[in-house]
């Protein structure tokens, strides 16, 4: 699995971006959001149980990510038509404000090192900085949904470019190593 300090791989994938038939699909590639932070999360399968809870929460907090100049991108190995059908079928997914990328060839999923032995993506999350460097990587067990608020908290911490202690939240004090070393 790729980790902190690695470059995020190049990709060009079809995404479901709308339920309007003439605007439903768009090609998204590694340069689409160049110069922005990206939160790229993978889910195992469409039409499942935990996945829509996570996707809906990323959608609910999308404005918070956008306020931090971060583009949310969701990815699974399902095709774009399955994404479309799922969005249309599931009330919590109909108004998603971010692209659902189709990695049907499993190229990005494999390049990130999150393709499971069962042929589907693991429940992985990456925060990628504007220089395309991974600053955060996490995988949870398939039976455990991720905490999207924690992903946002980590993004906030990364964007301070300062030392953030345990349980730090936006607006809280960061650490000053020089003062701490001096005993102040």
Where are these regions (language model features)?
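Chalcogenol-based redox active-site neighborhoods
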Residues: 1-184
């Amino acid at each position: 699995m790729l980790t902190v300090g690695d470059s995020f791989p190049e990709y060009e994938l079809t995404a479901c971006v709308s339920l309007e038939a003439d605007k439903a699909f768009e090609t998204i590639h590694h340069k689409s959001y160049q110069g922005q932070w990206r939160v790229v999360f993978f889910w195992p399968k469409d039409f499942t149980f935990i996945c829509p809870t996570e996707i809906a929460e990323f959608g609910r907090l999308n404005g918070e990510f956008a306020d931090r100049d971060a583009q949310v991108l969701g990815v699974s190995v399902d095709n774009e038509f399955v994404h479309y059908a799922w969005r249309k079928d599931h009330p919590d997914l109909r108004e998603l404000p971010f692209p659902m990328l189709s990695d049907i060839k499993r190229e990005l999923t494999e390049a990130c090192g999150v393709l499971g032995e069962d042929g589907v993506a693991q429940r992985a999350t990456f925060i990628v900085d504007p220089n395309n460097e991974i600053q955060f990587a996490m995988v949870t067990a398939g039976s455990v949904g991720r905490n999207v608020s924690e992903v946002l908290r980590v993004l906030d911490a990364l964007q301070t470019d300062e030392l953030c202690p345990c349980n730090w939240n936006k607006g809280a004090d960061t650490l000053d190593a020089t003062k701490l070393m001096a005993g102040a």
